């Protein structure tokens, strides 16, 4: 397998690592030696550096990575692949009884084509768990749902996950976390959950992906004009100048950032695409050399000031800052809200080397112990990127596996009294892979469970007793981080810049064109994927490192994922309390956050 040094350097830059040329060449050799592509190799390297607490990248770290990590892990993976290639896939997430019934139906069909004298010769079923003896198998009862074996009768639990020693460790905190008792009332209080629409909420499936290019163009143009109008009013700008109009004096232009080619944006390839009203959608190259500070990405709506003497190139001298939406104003119904605890977790809920749901069962135990008022659970619940899903080793329909997983969560947490909110993911293999993504459909809820369980769309703005949560399972931090270019005179926090873009662009996915694996229906995107207000709390799970940050008054939380490869990951818990109304300055209702290892 060949590897590109340039691609490796770009992958490393996504994680903020600059590498010497000699080390890049060494990584190229490792890619060829171990049969890895650039993305996979960098992912393994970052995982190694994170687990061993290494900072930076040196030749010693690279040698250690090769000898202690790659040679063991990848050779083991190749060995297991060769070993498994000679037999059928593991029988996961299906009862042995169902397998036996399938075998018997096949026998009946075969016997119908033979003469009666030959009789029925049933094939014996032999597995390591059930040798060739008289079999006695009973059907599963619903009470076995919480047993790991019910998810995967023949799968081996992950040894690395079960041998972890840091469970329950608080890895980062925010606010008054030390003085908070991290236990809720199990929904015993007055909990009100409402989905906010902009202008309406997505509640069901829709016809997707039949869109014409003019319709996409219309959505993008409307976005430029609407945001431009808000910024024009905020900064008291008299008028915008057409992009292609030559002028000797400084001009103010409105447009959307783009790239002059299909490659990654850089400071030499920036173009500004004008709005329809003033510039008829014209494009003009932008010279950023006069700007001391900037942060730009494709699809960003901006107002620039600069010199455009020829009408063919803008020398930018000023970049106007974006302006976020106002915060939600609580109503009288929200006035009796005192305090509540919210738990947030993001899938996958299985480790990469096993399809058993041990991490999910541990999370259920945490919920029953802490009794949070609300639990927000993000997909994927059955990960499309899991090895056994990709290799078609599962013997039960994806939909059935998901329903069993869902039933386990609902029944397993019923005693806690917690309200459950389920947010889908584009990596949920059974669900519609379109953005915005409709809520899960689950018709087996009892009347009592319907009061406690809520299915919302991806993305979604959710009000919990008047505290607005922005929810998205899409890894926007990773997507925007890979495309953003920036220049700063001082130290600049990359995550804070990206989060600020989300809030000031007023969209759950402001990047255009989107990442290749994103299937966006732009007509629905315009209706369902915009921010109605600036959320009090933005939950934005990512493969990147967990964090909690206050950005423009919004508490932004990356809870991490519940599993990271073969090891346990993290989840978050938040403590909400409505501040006193007599204060002149706004105070966040989210007073404390902790990110905890499962």
UniProtKB/Swiss-Prot annotation:
InterPro entries: DNA_pol_a/d/e_bsu, DNA_pol_alpha_B_N_sf, DNA_pol_alpha_bsu, DPOA2_OB, Pol_alpha_B_N. The modification Phosphoserine is found at residues 126, 141, 147, 152, 154. Keywords: DNA replication, Nucleus, Phosphoprotein. Belongs to the DNA polymerase alpha subunit B family. Residues 112-140 have a biased composition (Polar residues). It comes from the Eukaryota. This is DNA polymerase alpha subunit B. GO terms for cellular component: alpha DNA polymerase:primase complex; ciliary basal body; cytosol; intracellular membrane-bounded organelle; nucleoplasm. It comes from Homo sapiens. Component of the alpha DNA polymerase complex (also known as the alpha DNA polymerase-primase complex) consisting of four subunits: the catalytic subunit POLA1, the regulatory subunit POLA2, and primase complex subunits PRIM1 and PRIM2 respectively. Within the complex, POLA1 directly interacts with PRIM2/p58. Residues 141-158 have a biased composition (Low complexity). GO terms for molecular function: DNA binding. The modification Phosphothreonine is found at residues 127, 130. The N-terminal 240 amino acids are sufficient to mediate complex formation. Its main location: nucleus. Residues 112-167 are annotated as: Disordered. Phosphorylated in a cell cycle-dependent manner, in G2/M phase. One of its GO terms (biological process) is protein import into nucleus. The gene is POLA2. PANTHER family: DNA POLYMERASE 2 ALPHA 70 KDA SUBUNIT, DNA POLYMERASE ALPHA SUBUNIT B. Accessory subunit of the DNA polymerase alpha complex (also known as the alpha DNA polymerase-primase complex) which plays an essential role in the initiation of DNA synthesis. During the S phase of the cell cycle, the DNA polymerase alpha complex (composed of a catalytic subunit POLA1, an accessory subunit POLA2 and two primase subunits, the catalytic subunit PRIM1 and the regulatory subunit PRIM2) is recruited to DNA at the replicative forks via direct interactions with MCM10 and WDHD1. It is found in: Nucleus.
